[in-house]
Swiss-Prot record:
UniProt KW Metal-binding keyword: yes
The name this protein goes by in its record: Cysteine--tRNA ligase
Gene: cysS
GO cellular component terms, semicolon-separated: cytosol
Root EC class: ligase
SMART domains on file: DALR_2
Species per Swiss-Prot/TrEMBL record: Coxiella burnetii (strain RSA 331 / Henzerling II)
């Protein structure tokens, strides 16, 4: 098996530190808002990685953290007039609901930053002892970036060309703009913990270093996350972990490509996010999972209704091939499974793996046409087993196909309403009335208001 290592910028033969066992840490959510489908892509990608590694016989320890104390949590809690702890707890429950709705496997361990404050303090003290950290004039403790000679090795940037990143705060207390905070001095009304440097709370980056190493040891096999975390977050994790423990942090780094809308990254700051909950109102979970895994995990992926519809049609082909076949035990594998493994062993090449699944669909249909039902059923069982790695083909064919028809009907209704609104905007009342009649024939009642057009099925 070969996996692309962001640290070396090349595919490497994957050999776990301990034979047969894989220790994987993935950066989780900062719990102050709803998860959007950009997060969902990263979660589903690493869900696929865990499922595949386990299918290949590895004993995987999967750790994904929760950041439950952060500037954004404190700010949002203040706006909502609730405590940061209450806000975090509420969104942790929402996160778990979304995780279940996405069919994402729960991590083996899900540490919260607030549970690891003693370990964080211990690591900061090591950095101070090793002279990689200092206390600023404002009482915050900072990491001395220029003291760590390997800084920039993950993002492949030279220190002299680096600028303070989006999540690196500017402060007069820093020796260098790139220095980042390890411990923030307490402010009135904020959550705080005792430390040798006074009351305060951890910085964002140090949390992941302390949690991952405390649970998995150092070094461990794979650290994953979205591409947007590569710099400065993951770069800072390497610096503080290796400076503190004086040994390598992680063997292999994996980064999931970003989800884009109109060629822009999906992010809260750009205001173009679509929550998981909104997406699942529009599309079945299998359609969403198929779409999010259809491109190679390292590449950007463009979110659009057209791409989701292509995903629905693709799954329809799978389920039509499975419909009406007897259910048999999956006992034997064919060359299709070997070729599937070959694709997935090449840096989790899901586009090639999906192409192979479509080959299996065509073969199943050929067996059907030749009335070789037993052969079709055996291959269908193999197809379902491989589909499970992607969290797909979990419905009965009848269940999915009935739901897909309803989804297609809704999309058709929305399309007609959009066309009618365009006609009304052009004052083409004849066309608008014709479309209204079409909708009436479909059993759809529409109501126009200043907020737009609403509809219901009668």
């Amino acid at each position: 098996m070969k996996i692309f290592n962001s640290l070396t910028k090349q595919k490497e033969i994957f050999k776990p530190i301990e034979s047969g066992k894989v220790k994987l840490y993935v950066c989780g959510m900062t719990v102050y808002d709803y998860m959007h489908i950009g997060h969902g892509r990263s979660w589903i990608i690493f869900d696929m990685v865990v499922r595949y590694l386990r299918m290949r016989g590895y004993e995987v320890t999967f750790v994904r953290n929760i950041t439950d104390i952060d500037d954004k949590i404190i700010k949002r809690a203040g706006e909502n007039k609730e405590s940061p702890a209450a806000l975090a707890e509420r969104f942790i429950q929402i996160l778990h609901e979304d995780e279940k709705a996405l069919r994402v496997l729960s991590p083996d361990q899900e540490p919260r930053a607030t549970q690891y404050v003693p370990e964080i303090i211990k690591l900061i003290q090591k950095l101070l002892d090793n002279q990689y950290a200092y206390t600023g004039q404002n009482g915050d403790v900072f990491f001395d970036v220029r003291r760590f000679k390997d800084y920039g090795k993950l993002s492949h940037r030279h220190l002299d060309k680096l600028q303070a990143g989006a999540r690196v705060e500017v402060s007069d207390s820093k020796r260098d703009p790139l220095d980042f905070v390890l411990w923030k001095k307490a402010k009135p009304g904020e959550p705080k913990w005792d430390s040798p440097w006074g009351e305060g709370r951890p910085g964002w980056h140090i949390e992941c270093s302390a949690m991952s190493s405390s649970i998995l040891g150092q070094p461990f096999d794979i650290h994953g996350g979205g591409l947007d975390l590569k710099f400065p977050h993951h770069e800072n994790e390497i610096a503080q972990s290796e400076a503190g423990e004086e040994k390598p942090f992680v063997k292999l780094w994996m980064h999931a490509g970003l989800l884009e809308i109109n060629k822009e990254k999906m992010s809260k700051s750009l205001g173009n996010i679509i929550s998981i909950r909104e997406a699942l109102k529009e599309s079945d979970v299998e359609v969403l999972r198929y779409f999010l895994l259809s491109g190679h995990y390292r590449n950007p992926l463009s979110y659009s209704k057209e791409n989701l519809e292509n995903g629905r049609l693709a799954l329809e082909r799978f389920y039509l091939a499975l419909r009406g076949l007897p259910v048999v035990n999956h006992e034997k594998t064919s060359s299709y499974t070997d070729r599937f493994y070959e694709a997935m062993d090449d840096d989790f090449n899901t586009p090639i793996a999906f192409a192979l699944l479509f080959e299996m669909v065509r073969e199943i249909n050929r067996f059907r046409d030749n009335n070789q039902i037993e052969k079709a059923a055996v291959l269908a069982a193999e197809l379902k087993c491989l589909g499970n790695i992607f969290g797909l083909l979990q419905y009965s064919p009848e269940q999915f196909l009935q739901g897909a028809k309803k989804e297609a009907d809704v999309q058709e209704i929305k399309k007609l309403i959009d066309q009618r609104n365009e006609a009304r905007a052009k004052k083409d009342w004849k066309t608008a009335d014709q479309i209204r009649d079409q909708l009436t024939d479909l059993g759809v009642a529409i109501e126009d208001s200043s907020d737009g057009t609403s509809w219901r099925q009668e």
